[in-house]
């Protein structure tokens, strides 16, 4: 139910506005279901690495599906870039726009391809339907196109500025084929792009149906109400905060090519009706692909504000207006062209963690949490299809341990913050690719000990069944960037990446590694970070310790040495 405003910025029909808001969300949910169910690549159909949104004719976000928070910046950026390049009067019914470039089209990294379709009513542009999907490969020297060690956007794959993919209903098949020919699996790319176009058609038809049912004036008035209400609701939350400045930082292990750690620092300043986020103090632009484009930075900030102040607030343009963001140009949080950005999700996660840390100075203990795994590790396996021309690219980002909360343990084996994708089921992996899952498990003792325990990390070990499989990975929190505990809680366990584990040929790999050619029967094991603990381990309730021991989440050694308890007495309690 819509809450009352603290000033005269009231709504004529709060209940109707709430119903309308949910109508918009139902349209985006239907669009997302279409995109997921009809797609061909495992990264979209199984892992759901995609998002959808609706914009008005002025480019304001009206509604976004509940998928990937990090996509919020790219979709907004794409919409802005389209309207900057194309005057509204030049856009025709049946046009389709495509883009992905962080510098030329306000994207976040090249694998995230935006498709935007105008929605007309009675001959006039009224809305846009948009979606974004992470394609498993867009070219470049490393399969997957997200390697942390690349040093230029020119090396990361095909760059697509704002481009008309269709004009007045006619798709430019030559352009579509040109884009797909620059990837390792043109057939899969082509099919997924066509699904993206179809998804927008479905969303456009739903918006036209809503206008037909309610009337155009009522729809436009309701859109204004929804955006205005979101803004006022966030202002109410800001008014509850203590004014002042709060600084926190997190760290990357390195800049993608080794070397020293890189700081990600934010200063949050609370004003009477504004939040200001200043990233001065963050490290200089990375040599590798760890750089965070400014629209991805904005998405990180919007996500954190929504998650911490009002998780149920509708994500639309009203959320953005009271928030100011500054990041010096030429730093890792606002890189200059042609800096590489393919591994930007690691940095986005760390930025979100830093913002959560800054809010610790504002929120009561029961509303803060320890740091989570905050790094979004990714693995990529590539090779030749056995049944058709081209190469397969299996890409997956992995979860880990979430940070412990005041009164509950951190969630185990989960994506945190900005990603929100699903795991690829073992059956799907082994059915699609010449790979075998040796192990997929949670790692005992990986969550930081505390009164409440950090979430457990994931171990995933995959074996090549044929020779010539090419492996790449990008991760973090192998050295300094671990999940920190709060209020006496211990840090979470570090991440690891190992080739041929538990064999005479075992080899520890660098966290950002690329193009390792595996022979048949060779394997790679990735261990993700655990979450930080909350409160001193000695304060942990015996019943929780007993349950952890029975579930295998902590070892007897940890119970004795870290928690300081006698195992037999805990088991019998």
Roles of regions detected by a PLM:
Residues 2-93, 98-572:
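Glycine/proline-enriched, intrinsically flexible loops and inter-domain linkers
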